[in-house]
Amino acid sequence: RNISKGVTGFSEMCRTMGAVPGAKTIKIAIEDPTEKDMELMHITPDKKILVLERIRYADEKPVLLEINRFPESFSFLFGENLNDTSLYDVLQNHNIIFDHSDKTLDIVFASAQEAKILGISKGYPLLRIESTIYNTDCSLVQRCKQLCIGDKFKFTI
């Protein structure tokens, strides 16, 4: 089941692999935008963004740290239970439909904080996937950075 053309979420990928997806919210906050947020979301420094960080699990094992950045209009997410659920399903229930995304992939090494969150050693290689996700009007809906333990999860892009 594709919830939108060209964009596949973590939960859907897990199910396709025969794994049970899970999620634990570790942060949800309204913050000042970064320069990149302002550039991609076409917002000014006086605007705010919503930041959502979650640990993603496959069969109850941590495999990915997910950092999502949304326009402040997504503050309705504060009222949602975002643990053990598909974020894309939650957004779809709010009539937010994804159309396409741009992705950049590279290898990075886990910081002490990332290593602690994911249960790995500092310096462990991670696959970093940075995505900008757009709706059918080609408006940016979400920026997402995923740090994936490459030997524990396989991405289909």
Model-derived segments and their meaning:
Residues 25, 51-52, 65, 128-129, ...:
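Hydrophobic residues on conserved beta-strands that form the core of alpha/beta folds
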